[in-house]
């Protein structure tokens, strides 16, 4: 969730906030380390309360969210973006809320509690993100915009969409874990 919040701050304060890309990269490295630690512990643990494969799938899915988020921050700099489009800021807010829902759902899975309130909201947010990206890409092609700007922003919008889609994948995995263990 921290990486998503930092991306939201980065887009809200751009270009002055470009330095936040470094903090997002640190979050990405921390996520990778955590995923490696999960794998290490799974290899050392004989019995787990949840299927080992499900734990690994969930850890990987959560790491993907951070990876995609960091990718967006990196490409903002690589593409020399001068100012963010409002639709990118809206997508970042969707990403923040979806990661917040996942953050609230994950602890509930330990006791196999009902997480549907959170996963349904993640699915709703993913649909909202889809609507935002379609409208954003459509607005790029309404004329009068430099073709290089169109190419850059189309790619950035799609990368943001990948991060949001990854939250839905994580929610699906959480739902599967609860169903398996109910």
Please provide the spans of the model-predicted regions.
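Cytosolic, long alpha-helical scaffolding segments
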Residues: 1-182
